[in-house]
């Protein structure tokens, strides 16, 4: 398993750095800013589908999924979301990234390993 180091980005949100690949999961200029702009503002909000279907290959940190959940609740829109990840993160790492707000800790999210 590859080492992953949590780093703060310029907007204050966290991302992961993989030294073996010399690669970050998100832009170091802002993980949340990048995901919000690309995935939500230019993707989800631009869709006219009543119930959008999203397939994310390379689920990564789950930030795109998290922002999608927030937008779905804000817009009262149903979204069918599937995320695939070959190397899923440990729950402890997800918690340390700090994306999940206290108001959502009641959620039980389904997972299935294939």
Predicted regions and their residues:
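Rossmann-like AdoMet
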Residues: 1-52, 69-103
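Conserved small/polar residues in nucleotide/adenosyl-binding loops
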Residues: 105-111
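Glycine-rich SAM-binding Motif I of class I
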Residues: 62-66
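Conserved class I S-adenosyl-L-methionine
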Residues: 51-60
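Short, glycine/acidic-enriched loop or turn micro-motifs at the edges of active sites
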Residues: 59, 88, 111
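Acidic active-site catalytic centers that drive phospho-/nucleotidyl reactions
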Residues: 56, 85, 108
